[in-house]
């Protein structure tokens, strides 16, 4: 079992499940895993509850992550072998992720943002573009629709960093709605 993850009825939807993986739709305002101030309201708690209700053993093996305020698909491995295979596929970029977001202002029809991301000095959570010490981060975007106030974007990440889309869109002067 996953130590420290208490089974709790946190809502999510199962999109796909087989003997190897579980794919769920994570709602917005749901942290992925327990952290300071979030011990019983996370997706991990909900997944533990799900398996407890089925009477199946549970080890939390989350393959991808999304920010707390982001909704989308999360892939979980149901055993060590599928975790190893899926983790390697993520590292070698065989798994492609496409996101949609709304950003302030009118963005170009398409673009690529190639700017390294690092932790903001003095913060464990916040990230920023940092050309001196950041890790390579690349975002490709395409504008699906726009008006004078905001743009609806489709985004693809070459790399995966914490707050990647949020940081890159703010960097080019088009912060995500709500930021």
Which residues does each predicted region cover?
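RNA pseudouridine synthases
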Residues: 1-179
């Amino acid at each position: 079992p996953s130590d420290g993850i208490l089974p709790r009825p946190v809502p999510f939807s199962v999109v796909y499940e087989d003997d190897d993986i579980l794919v769920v739709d994570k709602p917005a305002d749901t942290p992925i895993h327990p952290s300071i101030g979030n011990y019983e309201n996370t997706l991990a708690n909900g997944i533990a509850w799900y398996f407890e209700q089925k009477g199946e053993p549970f080890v939390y093996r989350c393959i991808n992550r999304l920010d707390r305020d982001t909704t989308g698909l999360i892939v979980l491995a149901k055993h060590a072998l599928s975790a190893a295979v899926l983790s390697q596929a993520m590292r070698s970029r065989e798994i492609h992720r496409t996101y949609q977001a709304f950003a302030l202002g009118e963005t170009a029809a398409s673009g690529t943002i190639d700017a390294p991301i690092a932790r903001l000095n003095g913060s464990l959570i916040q990230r920023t573009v940092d050309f001196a010490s950041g890790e390579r981060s690349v975002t490709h975007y395409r504008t699906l629709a726009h008006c004078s106030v905001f743009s609806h974007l489709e985004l693809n990440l070459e790399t995966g960093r914490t707050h990647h889309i949020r940081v890159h869109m703010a960097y080019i002067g088009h912060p995500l709605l709500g930021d």
